[in-house]
Amino acid sequence: YVVSDALELQVGIDWRTAAIEHAREVRDLLGGDYYVDFADDNAPDGKVVRLGDEIAYHNSTTVDWFGAFLQGKYDVAKFNLYGMGGISTIGYTYKDHFSVEKELVEADNITTFQIKGGGRYNLDDRMSAFANIGYVQKPPILDNVIAYDGTVSQDPDNEKFISNEFGGEYNSDKVSVKLSSYNTQWKDRNLTKSVNTGQGDSGDTDIIYLTGVNQSHKGWEVESQIALHEMVDLNLAISNGVWKFDGDAKGDYQEMEYNEDGQVIGQTTTEYEYALDGLKVGDMPQTSYVGGLTVKPIEGLRIQGLYKWYDNHYSDWSPDSREVSGDVDRAQVWKTPSYGKLDLHLSYKLPTVGGLDMTLSGHLFNALDDVYVQDAVDNSQYNGFGDKVHAAHNAEVFLGTPRHFNVGLSVNF
């Protein structure tokens, strides 16, 4: 809705619902006539199943979502401002068809909201400064609200993102530079963990809902493009971040105690702690340097070399691996070796034929055929060796793809 030449508003609603069935199905009897499955509690002596029947597990879930938002932008003089606010609610249900009760488990609706705002100030035709700030709540996913055994988390916390960003830009005919700094605090990340407590109706395996899992993501970035010549462009970019966990986490498991008549006579609580404070967030390089040179020797031909260097890449790991049991393990997760790789790109716009615009392109990735660790898992359960000390021999590594290429032809008509 256009309020005035300077102010424009937009409002919207979002309603979604989904019903999902989860099951494992018999697809091949391997020459047999039937199979006996013992997963269904309604058939404790086993159930004869044939092609198309469900085995192992069978449950159904529903997800109901409703949201509304209002956003607007305001442009006046040298200022460009915007803001938005939204609210949503989500509800989950769960039914286990292999349980005797087959009860519909329904969790209370979860409400979230978000608010964002920001603006840009144009100092002149070439320079501008900008700032953004936001607070966003994210509801926990169904698995973190209702566990596979039907356990409902009591008052699950919404995940919260508090972020701000500020920076500046400079743009001229030959030089473009963007500098920005960011700070994002991720609060109350929702995680669950299966543990052997010796408690619970499910046997020795129970669900622990972790609280206090917080992350801090801070850093700065620089991007630039410089026209060295009408046929040569230089691209440079640097990104440096410090992403780590803030504080430790804990989780409680509470189990009701019953007498022979089924009456509640007490409660047993088991507390679990997780040493996370100061550990680096894994599975993503926190520092990168990019340099690129683009050459356009003739009209329609574009050749680019792009070299990327990655550093401070910590291996992937899960907070539940730092459960406090005896000596507290606060050793940093394994950091993979730094690495760089060169990619080459070429494109040529062919002459138009019969009204068809055609572009030939080719890409050579990892042109120097470097060997590097692209991903890793810290203290791998299955592929690590020796004592678990967060070292290279404890990690499971995935090497980057060797030199490879592709060639393509795009046609527009």
Predicted regions and their residues:
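Residues on the lipid-exposed face of transmembrane beta-strands in outer-membrane beta-barrel proteins
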Residues: 1-5, 11, 68-74, 117-121, ...
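Repeated loop/turn-to-beta-strand initiation elements of outer-membrane beta-barrel proteins
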Residues: 7-9, 78-81, 126-129, 174-177, ...
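Surface-exposed loop/turn segments flanking beta-strands in extracellular/periplasmic regions
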Residues: 23-54, 149-155, 193-209, 255-273, ...
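C-terminal beta-signal and adjacent terminal beta-strands/loops
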Residues: 234, 300, 309-321, 348-413
